[in-house]
């Protein structure tokens, strides 16, 4: 597969306190001359080599971070849906993902008693809240 030289590749470097991110457009906004199947089939997904042997980011790794990114934070909190949720927040998105475990209504057990242990199993429910 014939790839362009690095000087023919448009890229923008974003520097933040958390990461240095290079955004790469391999074909300068033009439609890629290769199918996505060809692009994603490469063994080395992070970098490719040009005709001269120099390495540069590929379409597969559109963003390449050079610094360690912070961990995603987890904490419990009361959701607006009235359930105790495990909240997953990432510093790079406004979306907050919640995973809630709730029991279904009690169902009769084999001996006629009503108990959560003999009724329906816990149902894992997931919903998404977006904070602005």
Curated annotation (Swiss-Prot):
Domain of life: Viruses
Function: May play a role in infectivity.
Name of the protein in question: Protein p15
The organism of origin for this protein: Panicum mosaic virus (strain United States/Kansas 109S) (PMV)
């Amino acid at each position: 597969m014939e790839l362009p030289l690095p000087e023919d590749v448009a890229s923008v470097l974003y520097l933040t306190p958390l990461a240095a991110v290079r955004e790469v457009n391999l074909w300068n906004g033009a439609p890629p001359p290769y199918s996505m199947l060809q692009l994603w089939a490469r063994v080395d997904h992070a970098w490719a080599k040009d005709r001269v042997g120099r390495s540069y980011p590929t379409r597969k790794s559109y963003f390449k971070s050079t610094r360690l990114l912070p961990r995603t934070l987890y904490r419990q909190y009361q959701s607006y849906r009235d359930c105790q949720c495990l909240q997953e927040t990432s510093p790079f998105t406004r979306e907050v993902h919640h995973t809630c475990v709730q029991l279904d209504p009690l169902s009769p057990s084999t001996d006629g008693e009503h108990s959560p242990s003999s009724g329906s199993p816990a149902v894992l429910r997931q919903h998404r809240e977006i904070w602005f």
